[in-house]
Amino acid sequence: EYLKEHVDAQTACVLIQHPNYYGNLEEAAEIGEITHVAGAKYVMNVNPISLGVVKTPAEYGADVAVGEGQPLGLSIAFGGPYLGFMAATQKMMRNLPGRIVGQTEDHNGKKGYVLTLQAREQHIRREKASSNICSNQALCALAVGVYLATMGNEGIKKAATLSTSKAHYLSAELAKVGYQTENKGEFFHEFVTVSDV
């Protein structure tokens, strides 16, 4: 209701975190509908591992998806370096900053990934470049690429399923000793507890 009352023609976009700060899964489809009815763009900030068990931002109608790549095999390294990711609908693709990776086939029919829309890059048109990538970011991107290739779709799904089931198990066990879970509805792998202790 709050969103319906506050989103109007003056709203540029609505951004939600899914799962949110407390671990809750938002009513993402409904939020997307409200946002689009107002003519605004819908942006979802997602935990990439959660996508193994919840719908993708595209399935919720998001125009843009963003997130932190740290859960994808990057160690916690005193605050960085990390990498972020950003994806958009094809209609919005040319408005994205940074380097865009596309899927293609080589002359032998093998799947490959390439940097696409190269005319936007520093080495082609420095004065109009929309990216600035340094070697640390490239190293993080390589590490995430290796992690994703190693895990595959089933590995990501298994990691997400284990994270969710273990969080729900912990929530149930904590409830036995007086810590009640405050989350309303479904949560992914984070949750809030309270206790009289």
Task: Indicate where each model-derived feature is located.
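A generic structural motif
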Residues: 20, 151-155, 197
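Conserved PLP-binding catalytic core of the aspartate aminotransferase-like
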Residues: 179-197
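Active-site C-terminal subdomain of aminotransferase-like
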Residues: 72-177, 181-184
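Short, hydrophobic beta-strand segments
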Residues: 16-17, 146-149, 189-194
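Conserved PLP-enzyme active-site core in the AAT-like
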Residues: 1-114, 178, 192
